[in-house]
Amino acid sequence: MSDETNAAVWDDSLLVKTYDESVGLAREALARRLADSTNKREEENAAAAEEEAGEISATGGATSPEPVSFKVGDYARATYVDGVDYEGAVVSINEEKGTCVLRYLGYENEQEVLLVDLLPSWGKRVRREQFLIAKKDEDEQLSRPKASAGSHSKTPKSSRRSRISGGLVMPPMPPVPPMIVGQGDGAEQDFVAMLTAWYMSGYYTGLYQGKKEASTTSGKKKTPKK
């Protein structure tokens, strides 16, 4: 190999070495910039955390929403046995037990509810809707027995009794659960309709069995002994 060729090879080696050194320096510079950026971001986060901690300590701790308190006469809502919320008025409070008695608007039935389970009312419009629906249901229930009872006298709900032959006193019709106030979906309405049908079916089934047993007992008493 000639001296010129050897010189060319030597020059290439120097070029490669210089390139590698330049790349290494560039990588070191990039690494330093990344490290500086990371350290700066960590310092900013630490400063923000210290500032937030100082604000919390200055105000006496983290702020939390105050619980809603109710008193007698306030409107509130609670979850009934059918899993739906209904509007009512607080009629009494037992501080020792942490409970209150809530009277549902329109239905006039009362339920003991934990104070922590009480929820704020949805407003005047929803309360009025519930009241109108309850009264409509009551009118429909009163019109059905009137058509089927014939000459039976009309008595207040609290003293109403169903007497059958033989002197047996039937219990009053069980209270029908309040209907949906328009806030639930179709599934909830179907569920309440099912409960209503179940209540009515159970009452009239018991009424039929009671009449049948009373009739059988009366027939046995009238049969002369041999």
Curated annotation (Swiss-Prot):
Entry's Gene Ontology BP terms: AMPA glutamate receptor clustering; basal protein localization; central nervous system development; chromosome organization; cytoplasmic U snRNP body assembly; embryo development ending in birth or egg hatching; excitatory postsynaptic potential; larval development
Domain Tudor, residue spans: 69-128
Gene3D superfamilies associated with the record: 2.30.30.140
Positions of the UniProt region annotated as Required for homodimerization: 159-226
Disruption phenotype: Embryos lacking maternal and zygotic Smn die between 0 and 4 hours after egg laying. Zygotic mutants form pseudopupae or fail to pupate and instead persist as third instar larvae, often surviving at this stage for several days. Larvae are smaller, developmentally arrested and have reduced motor function. Mutant larvae exhibit reduced CNS, testes and muscle size, decreased locomotion and altered rhythmic motor activity.
Keyword Cytoplasm: yes
Family annotation (Pfam families): SMN_G2-BD, SMN_Tudor, SMN_YG-box
Cellular location(s): Cytoplasm; Nucleus; Cytoplasm, U-body; Nucleus, Gem
Amino acid composition bias (Basic and acidic residues), ranges on this chain: 35-44
Gene Ontology cellular component list: Cajal body; cytoplasm; cytoplasmic U snRNP body; Gemini of Cajal bodies; I band; neuromuscular junction; nucleus; plasma membrane
SUPFAM superfamilies in the record: Tudor/PWWP/MBT (SSF63748)
Family the entry assigns: Belongs to the SMN family.
Protein name, UniProt field: Survival motor neuron protein
Upper classification of the organism: Eukaryota, Metazoa, Ecdysozoa, Arthropoda, Hexapoda
Gene: Smn
